[in-house]
Amino acid sequence: MKNKFFITLFACLLPWMAGAQQTIFKQNNVAEKDYIAYLFTYFTGNHISEEAVCYAVSTDGYTYWALNDNKPVIDSKIISSTGGVRDPHILRCEDGKTFYMVVTDMVSDNGWDSNRAMVLLKSTDLVNWTSSIVNMQKRYAGQEKLKRVWAPQTIFDPEAGKYMIYWSMQYNGGADVIYYAYANRDFTDLEGEPKPLFIPENKKSCIDGDIVFKDGIFHLFYKTEGHGNGIKVATTRSLTSGQWEEQPDYKQQTPEAVEGAGTFKLIGQNKYILMYDVYMKGKYQFTETTDLKNFKVIDSEVKMNFHPRHGTIIPITRAELKRITDKWPSKEMGNMTIPNNPVLQGFHADPEILYSHQTKKYYIYSTTDGQPGWGGWYF
C-alpha cells in the first residue's frame, strides 16, 4: 500500500517537477557570483593599424594582460566602411549569453570630421562576430550637413523593452549632441529617426557618453567640449524623459585633458571604476568610487602590459575567459592566475565525489540549492 501510494504521488508530481526544471533552466541571466574575470575591449592609437578592436583580460579588475600580443582580434577592414574602428563598447545582453558591440567607423588620418557611420556587432561566444554598418547619411534623409558620428554605446531600456544605441553627432556650425535610437531585433540596424538623448543646460558640446545604471538611476558620464574640457555626470530615472539632473563638478582626477570615460562595477563589491584616456599625455587613469559621485585615483594599484585608448570593461565567466584565452593566448599570461573555485557554477550543496575504475574518471554529485524554501528539484 505504501509503495502504491508513493508511486501515485511521484507520478502526480512529475509534471510539476518538470515545470520547475523548465523555470530554472530558462533563466539564462548570469549571476554575479558566476563571474571570475574581466574583459577589456579597446583600441590603441591613431594610426590605421591601431584603429581596431583589441582584447585584454583581468581576474581582479586591476591587473590586465593583452590578448593576442596586443594585436587586433577583429579585422577592421572586414567590418567597417573606412578600414578603421575606434571606441569599442561591449554589452552583455539581458539573456546573459549574447554580446553586442558598437564601434565608431573611422580612420582619424582622414580627419576628425570625416566619418558618418558606426558598426553594430553581435556574438554569442566573444570570438565570432557578425557586423552591420549604419551610415547616417545613407540611412536617413536630410543629413547633408552631418560632420561626424562618434563613440556609440548600447544599453537596455527597461521602459521600452529594447536596446538603445546612443552616440554623439555634430552638424555644420552646431554643437556635438548625444542622440539615441533603438536597435532592431537582429541588432543589424536602427529603428526610427535619431532623437536627442541629452543636451546640457548650457547647450554646448558633449561627447563620449557612458551610461551606468545604479539604484534605480541612470548615470550619464560625458565629456564636455570647448568649455573646460572634462568628464561630467547627469542623472535621470527615465532615459527618454528628457529630465536630466546635471552635477556641476568634473569627475576626472587630473588637470590634464581627458576623454573616453568607461565605468564598470567590481565583481562582488560595492565599488565602481571610472577610467578615462589622458590622451595628451599618453596615459590611462583609473579612479574608484562607491557612489558615482566621489572618486579617488588608484593608478598605483593598476598594471597593464599595453596602452589602451577609449574602451570598456565587462565581467565574464570562467568558460568565457577560457574560450578567448585559448583563441588568443598571450606570452605574458603565464603570470595570471585563473581562479579554480567554485568547481561547479550555481548553487550546490552536499557534494560527493566518486572515482570510476571503468571510465578512469572522477564524478561529483551534488544537490541543488538556492531555491525558495530550501527547495531543490534536481541533482
Give the location of each predicted region.
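Carbohydrate-active catalytic/glycan-binding domains of CAZyme proteins
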Residues: Q21-F379
